[in-house]
Amino acid sequence: MRIGIVNDSALAVAALRRALALDTTLEIAWIAGDGEEAVRMAATQTPDLILMDLLMPVMDGVEATRRIMAESPCAIVVVTMDLGRNANQVFDAMGHGAIDAVDTPTLTDSDTKLAAGPLLRKIRNIARLLGGRGQAPHPLAAATPTPTAPRLVAIGASAGGPAALATLLGALPADFGAAVVAVQHVDEAFAQGMAEWLDAQCQLPVRLARAGEVPQAGAVVLAGTNDHLRLTSAGRLIYTPDPCDYLYRPSIDVFFESVVEHWRGEAIGVLLTGMGRDGAQGLKAMRERGFQTIAQDQATSAVYGMPKAAATLGAASEILPLQKIAPRLVMTCGGGRR
């Protein structure tokens, strides 16, 4: 895998060099000292993956991510110091198509492998994702409908998802007539910050899903850990490490499939922007169950991977531009009365 490094700190670049040297399958294609240089390098030597810092002179990592994804798209992971303090910039970069984020490893002679572990695990997962390796579908038993259960909107998103979720959820009215559960590919270290970031932009309350709760109409909950979020036979949300071999954690497919198996009311599946195929099989299972399913269109997707996979499978009953998804949900579920 060919990797570009974008960072203005000599110490950070040295740390990244040492971390990448631990895996012989990784090759440093180039190093850029600011976002503007990275945009030029990506255009002439597009790598498989870019490790993008956020705070740099000339052009910061958010704008560089936006430019690269528009002009020379490739996988981008934000790698910067003190991610927690820069959470808003992380979500902005992910909104433009960055896949993930991780702290810059701090390396010493004694703990190089340990410190580099989180970064290398993310890179290996991205390598698998770029190779197209997903999970095989398995037969599902559908739940028996119960008229008292509220309507559920199940949303999945990955690269580009934070901005897409902000647009979609921000357009839902305060009296929206369905429960909303969203699974965004984001490390649990950023989940709480993302929930707060979305809550500030939405009329509906947004928070992390709690184990044991039942989704409630008029509220949005987000998957909040690196375990999978799923529904139980009682219609309650739980976190589970199984299945262990899934590339994506939390997995959209796992949640969508649990909706098919256990949700006793009506449901709508929505698959937004993202790299790879997660959610496509689950959305197909939802459609086969008789649920309404929506995939974001190519023109408005920061990364047209997951929605494209869904469209190819025939998983989406509708393919819509992002700005038309919320009105469609309101039309179906109710809300926005004056």
UniProtKB/Swiss-Prot annotation:
NCBIfam families: PRK00742.1, PRK12555.1. InterPro entries: CheB-like, CheB_C, CheY-like_superfamily, Sig_transdc_resp-reg_Me-estase, Sig_transdc_resp-reg_receiver. It comes from Cupriavidus metallidurans (strain ATCC 43123 / DSM 2839 / NBRC 102507 / CH34) (Ralstonia metallidurans). Phosphorylated by CheA. Phosphorylation of the N-terminal regulatory domain activates the methylesterase activity. SUPFAM superfamilies: CheY-like, Methylesterase CheB, C-terminal domain. The keyword RNA-binding does not apply. The modification 4-aspartylphosphate is found at residue 53. Residues 145-330 form the CheB-type methylesterase domain. This is Protein-glutamate methylesterase/protein-glutamine glutaminase 2. Keywords: Chemotaxis, Cytoplasm, Hydrolase, Phosphoprotein, Plasmid. One of its GO terms (molecular function) is phosphorelay response regulator activity. Residues 2-119 form the Response regulatory domain. Belongs to the CheB family. It catalyses: [protein]-L-glutamate 5-O-methyl ester + H2O = L-glutamyl-[protein] + methanol + H(+); L-glutaminyl-[protein] + H2O = L-glutamyl-[protein] + NH4(+). CDD domains: CheB_Rec, REC_CheB-like. GO terms for cellular component: cytoplasm. Contains a C-terminal catalytic domain, and an N-terminal region which modulates catalytic activity.
